[in-house]
Amino acid sequence: MSDDGEQPGPGDGAARDELSGMDLVRRTLAEARAAARARGQDPGRGFAAGPAPRRVAGRRRSWSGPGPDTRDPQPLGKLTRDLAKKRGWSGHVAEGTVLGQWSRVVGAQIADHATPTALNEGVLSVTAESTAWATQLRIMQSQLLAKIAAAVGNGVVTSLKITGPASPSWRKGPRHIAGRGPRDTYG
């Protein structure tokens, strides 16, 4: 209150100085509610209003039962597979499976001697550790394609490009000139 007997208004800064603790909080809350009403909003009453009324109309809640239900927890693998299918990522995921899980797709023995290097437009490039393994993989090409199709689906890998190890190079340094051609290097 001020000295001349007037009541302080809601915007009066002197009234706030006189109030303390919970009185100040109540006054501030009342001002905020009044401002909300002035803007045409419903200020609400928070927890003082009591619990929200229960829904009477609509479907009653029922338990799942012993059989499978859409509300049952789903395996993470199934959820990610469905997400990839919805977003159109299935092709990219299949390509990543071929390159990332090569040993599981083709088997441990083949994976020990051959490495996938690239997958472009259905052509899988595979580098073998020796020319003998490259020849063996070329012979087994149809079986490899069948294993890959069984693991990731048909159409992901349509053909294989199998290469042996890179041949040795005797070039040294960044610049070179054409030499005399291939010679009998080894004797």
Curated annotation (Swiss-Prot):
Cross-referenced Pfam families: DciA
Residue ranges with Low complexity bias: 31-55
Record's compositionally biased regions (Basic and acidic residues): 14-30
Segments of this protein annotated with the region Disordered: 1-77, 166-187
Superkingdom in the source lineage: Bacteria
NCBIfam families: PRK03195.1 (NF002871)
Family statement: Belongs to the UPF0232 family.
HAMAP family noted in UniProt: UPF0232 (MF_00630)
Name listed for the protein in its UniProt record: UPF0232 protein MMAR_0004
Species of origin: Mycobacterium marinum (strain ATCC BAA-535 / M)
